[in-house]
């Protein structure tokens, strides 16, 4: 286990976290690294592009079929994908029943006890980040993931989620070794997105590791259940993911203890960048619109 780097990709649902992480890990394996992916998102889509398949059976689903986790063997839950990347999905309960984070806790314990972490250079956790509840915070809380990479964009809710995740990291940074490795901006083509991402990273005492430009080739690859690295290895977008992988690979020991900001500070930052309008601006726009309508009548 010495030399093992345990990283985690956090981010709000729908931000492109699983796509970004799988493309980055596919690029990382090309750097000669042995990788284990542990999917910690109830959607169980953290390994699909690596396996070139539909979502794999999850630890919780298989445990329910067999009776309990103790009845499972490692080969039941571990699948081998692109260039021998090992893949596991923890899964979650049926919607509205139980805690989705429970699958994360159960899976990580099972994998550790059964030797899944042996002979790998990286363990990567792909974690839902809209809420940093006990279960989803488990890779942070139990000092499993030492480097957290937050996938975000210039959209307000993505920024809000990134700040929330930073709060979760801060909570456990002093009791364990967890650090914020940096922010990854998955471009949504919003106003001043790069500037805003760099500004938030600075406010969080971190850095923007990479700005991933938007490219339709990502969707083309996804439709074929492939990463861009596999589908179009010579494309410009594949080069972006390789650059991101190299930055993460060279970022060992560079993580920081984050300094999250308040909701008011986040809103002020958006106002400074002209992303959010003040009440006065909105009122003035409304009055101008009403005046225009009155003239037209």
UniProtKB/Swiss-Prot annotation:
Sequence positions bearing ADP-ribosylarginine: 102
Protein name: Nitrogenase iron protein
Family as reported in the entry's similarity comment: Belongs to the NifH/BchL/ChlL family.
Molecular function in Gene Ontology: 4 iron, 4 sulfur cluster binding; ATP binding; metal ion binding; nitrogenase activity
Keywords per UniProt: 4Fe-4S, ADP-ribosylation, ATP-binding, Iron, Iron-sulfur, Metal-binding, Nitrogen fixation, Nucleotide-binding, Oxidoreductase
Transmembrane segments: none
Source organism, top-level taxon: Bacteria
Organism encoding this protein: Mesorhizobium japonicum (strain LMG 29417 / CECT 9101 / MAFF 303099) (Mesorhizobium loti (strain MAFF 303099))
């Amino acid at each position: 286990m010495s030399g093992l780097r345990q990283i985690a990709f956090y981010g709000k649902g729908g931000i492109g976290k699983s796509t970004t992480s799988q493309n980055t890990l596919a690029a990382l394996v090309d750097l000669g690294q042995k990788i284990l992916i542990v999917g910690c998102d109830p959607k169980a889509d953290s390994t699909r592009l690596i396996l070139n398949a539909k979502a794999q059976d999850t630890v919780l689903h298989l445990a329910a079929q067999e009776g309990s986790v103790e009845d499972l063997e490692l080969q039941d839950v571990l699948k081998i994908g692109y260039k021998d990347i090992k893949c596991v999905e923890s899964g979650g309960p049926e919607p509205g029943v139980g805690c989705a984070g429970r699958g994360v806790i159960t899976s990580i314990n099972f994998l550790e006890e059964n030797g899944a972490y042996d002979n790998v250079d990286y363990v990567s956790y792909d974690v839902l980040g809209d809420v940093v509840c006990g279960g989803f915070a488990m890779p942070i809380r139990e000092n499993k993931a030492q480097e957290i990479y937050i996938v975000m964009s210039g959209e307000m809710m993505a920024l809000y989620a990134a700040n929330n995740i930073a709060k979760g990291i801060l909570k456990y940074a002093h009791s364990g070794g967890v650090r914020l490795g940096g922010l990854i901006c998955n471009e949504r083509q919003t106003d001043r997105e790069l500037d805003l991402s760099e500004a938030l990273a600075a406010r969080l005492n971190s850095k923007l590791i990479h700005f991933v430009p938007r490219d339709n080739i990502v969707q083309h690859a996804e439709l074929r259940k492939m990463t861009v690295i596999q589908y179009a290895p010579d494309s410009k977008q594949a080069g972006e993911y390789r650059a991101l992988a190299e930055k993460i690979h060279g970022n060992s020991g560079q993580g920081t203890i984050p300094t999250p900001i308040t909701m008011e500070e986040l809103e002020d930052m958006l106002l400074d960048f002209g992303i959010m309008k003040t009440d006065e601006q909105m009122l003035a726009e409304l009055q101008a619109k009403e005046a225009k309508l009155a003239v037209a009548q």
